[in-house]
């Protein structure tokens, strides 16, 4: 499965890249919204791991741009700033959430839940 990981924190990108590759996935990383948008325009991804807060724009801005591209990857919001209200809002849109910090087991469970 081809996965795009978008996070401004290098350590988070590295961890997700390693963990997801170990599970047999193809992983591409992006350090911000512009980099991610360019990759989303040129490649098809089945899953998008997306941070909410990044220096050059928010994850929700990228989601809005994604809709215009007519691309429909499964989305997992991966952020330390997920409130119960936001979690409910994302759930109603079919978007999964993973609150930082998280454990490997939580990552795997969230990915499986998002794909089912």
Explain the meaning of each model-derived region.
Residues 51:
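Active-site residues of response regulator receiver
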Residues 29-47:
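Acidic, metal-coordinating helix/loop segments flanking the phosphotransfer/catalytic sites
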Residues 32, 58-61:
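Acidic catalytic/metal-coordinating carboxylates
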Residues 61, 81-98, 109:
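Alpha4 helix (beta4-alpha4-beta5 surface) of REC/receiver domains from two-component response regulators
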Residues 13, 55:
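The feature encodes the CheY-like receiver
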Residues 102-112:
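C-terminal output helix
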